């Protein structure tokens, strides 16, 4: 074992001790043939029984089927691969990695098993495509770039919701389909993916694409403009930052190089679109976020809070839902107070409490195709200086001026932009940014 490897294992011991071919269908014109896309181009589940309320009536019926020629498959990085990459410079053997994971309370065999399940399902997807004469490129996060997206007629995200968000982040062409396949249904919810039955029967999904037996779901996304003084439009990949600080340092160096500029820069359209949400707040969660906010070009309001979340209909069942949802305990307490204050003879049984709770929580969800933003203020501070007139509200445009010291603006949990004092972010929905996805029946 090298000295560095020994140092890593030794450090963990001390911590542990302290704690105890071308893609073409029938009639395609060859490898270079472009896809025939159905549909009219307008317009964190699926049609059929048990379909969530927020997707009821969504999507446009495909017309003529969908036959792409080239597909890029974006495969997620499994936890096993992530741990290998974290310690790649230490040159750990598999046995060393096993010991290191055990010291951290993680199961090496469990991670390896999930990795094999994911890998097997990715191979199933690729084999299914190639059996149809499809030209396929398999890429990981680091290899997934704009050139790869331009090459492909369609993008398949092989993983879970996080992989779907990654795959969508590079696709700015509203006509290019992005399809999610859950490669580990036992461990991943996969709200944005095809129904789990297609994980092991992907050829059936392909045949439905060919026959047009699906609907297009046009998911709205948030576009972001950044302007003001000392802004840094260089994005930081938070996944890569976990593995290495090099990228983050490069972004900081670029920021420092421009830090001396006092003049304000005009609005810059950022090269990402938010499919789920945008979060704005101090990097240190224990520090209050100070900012000014304007909704739909209204007056500016100074606020302090734990940050704010701006989501789409797609993201309304993700982080935003968990920020705003209420528990049955809170509903029961409120109803009891209302009963006492209003002298109501309301039968407060468990059935009523759960019904009220569910109806309120379901009201937080809306269709991914609706062109509106739901912004939520997290834990707003209310005193004689600061207030929040609206803790949650639908809007078409939100502008935020930072008064923070070390804040960030995070898009879909994966891409971060510095957002400090003087920076102004404008967020809105534009039809050109909608993402073309697929709805298949269960």
From Swiss-Prot:
Organism listed in the record: Homo sapiens (Human)
Q: Which family does it belong to?
A: Belongs to the NAD kinase family.
What protein does this entry describe?
NAD kinase 2, mitochondrial
In this UniProt entry, the residues modified to Phosphoserine are 188, 367
Look up the transit peptide and give its residue range.
1-62
Name the reaction it catalyses.
NAD(+) + ATP = ADP + NADP(+) + H(+)
Q: Where is this protein primarily located?
A: mitochondrion
Q: Which residues carry this modification: N6-succinyllysine?
A: 76, 302, 317
> Quaternary form?
Homodimer.
GO BP term, pick one: NAD metabolic process
Pathology noted in the entry:
2,4-dienoyl-CoA reductase deficiency: A rare, autosomal recessive, inborn error of polyunsaturated fatty acids and lysine metabolism, resulting in mitochondrial dysfunction. Affected individuals have a severe encephalopathy with neurologic and metabolic abnormalities beginning in early infancy. Laboratory studies show increased C10:2 carnitine levels and hyperlysinemia.
Entry-annotated residues carrying N6-acetyllysine: 76, 317, 397
GO CC annotations? mitochondrial matrix; mitochondrion
E.C. number: 2.7.1.23
Which Pfam families is this protein grouped with?
A: NAD_kinase
Q: Per its UniProt record, what SUPFAM superfamilies does this chain match?
A: NAD kinase/diacylglycerol kinase-like
Q: Which PANTHER family match?
A: NAD KINASE 2, MITOCHONDRIAL, PTHR13158
Q: How is the activity of this protein regulated?
A: Inhibited by NADH, NADPH and NADP(+).
Q: Which gene encodes it?
A: NADK2
| Positions of region (Disordered) | 24-60
Cite the Gene3D superfamilies for this sequence: Probable inorganic polyphosphate/atp-NAD kinase, domain 1, Probable inorganic polyphosphate/atp-NAD kinase, domain 2
Q: In which tissues is it expressed?
A: Widely expressed.
Function in brief = Mitochondrial NAD(+) kinase that phosphorylates NAD(+) to yield NADP(+). Can use both ATP or inorganic polyphosphate as the phosphoryl donor. Also has weak NADH kinase activity in vitro; however NADH kinase activity is much weaker than the NAD(+) kinase activity and may not be relevant in vivo.
């Amino acid at each position: 074992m090298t000295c560095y490897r020994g140092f890593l294992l030794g450090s963990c011991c001390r911590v542990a001790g302290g704690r105890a071919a071308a893609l073409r269908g029938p009639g395609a014109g060859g490898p270079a043939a472009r896809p025939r896309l159905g549909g009219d181009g307008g317009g964190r589940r699926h049609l059929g029984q048990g379909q969530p309320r927020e997707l009821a009536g969504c999507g446009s019926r495909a017309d003529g089927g969908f036959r792409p020629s080239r597909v890029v498959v974006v495969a997620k990085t499994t936890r096993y691969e992530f741990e290998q990459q974290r310690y790649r410079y230490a040159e750990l053997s598999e046995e060393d990695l096993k010991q290191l994971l055990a010291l951290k309370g993680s199961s090496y065999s469990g991670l390896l098993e999930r990795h094999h399940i994911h890998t097997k399902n990715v191979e199933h997807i690729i084999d299914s495509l190639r059996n149809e004469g499809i030209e396929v490129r398999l890429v990981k996060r680091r290899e997934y770039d704009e050139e790869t997206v331009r090459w492909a007629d369609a993008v398949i995200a092989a993983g879970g919701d996080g992989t779907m968000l990654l795959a969508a982040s590079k696709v700015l062409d509203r006509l290019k389909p992005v399809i999610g396949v859950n490669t580990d249904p036992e461990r991943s919810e996969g709200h944005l993916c095809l129904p789990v039955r297609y994980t092991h029967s992907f050829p059936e999904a392909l045949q439905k694409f060919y026959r047009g037996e699906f609907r297009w779901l046009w998911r709205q996304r948030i576009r972001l403009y950044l302007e003001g003084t000392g802004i840094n439009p260089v994005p930081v990949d938070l996944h890569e930052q976990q593995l290495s600080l090099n990228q983050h340092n490069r972004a900081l160096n670029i920021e420092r190089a421009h830090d001396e500029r006092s003049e304000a820069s005009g609005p810059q359209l950022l090269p990402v679109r938010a499919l789920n949400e945008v979060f704005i707040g101090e990097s240190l969660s224990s520090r209050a976020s100070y900012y000014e906010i304007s909704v739909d070009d209204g007056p500016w309001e100074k606020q302090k809070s734990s940050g704010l979340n701006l989501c789409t209909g797609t993201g309304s069942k993700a982080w935003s839902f968990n920020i705003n949802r209420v528990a049955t305990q809170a509903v029961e307490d409120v109803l009891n107070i209302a009963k006492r204050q209003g002298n109501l003879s309301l039968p407060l049984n468990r059935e009523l409490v759960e019904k009220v709770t569910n109806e309120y929580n379901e009201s937080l969800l809306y269709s991914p195709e609706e062109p509106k933003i739901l912004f939520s203020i997290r834990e707003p501070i209310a005193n004689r200086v600061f207030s929040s007139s609206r803790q949650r509200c639908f809007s078409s445009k939100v502008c935020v001026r930072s008064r923070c010291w070390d804040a960030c603006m995070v898009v879909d949990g994966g891409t971060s932009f510095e957002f400090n004092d003087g920076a102004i972010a404008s967020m809105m929905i534009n039809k050109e940014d909608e993402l073309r996805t697929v709805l298949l029946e269960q």
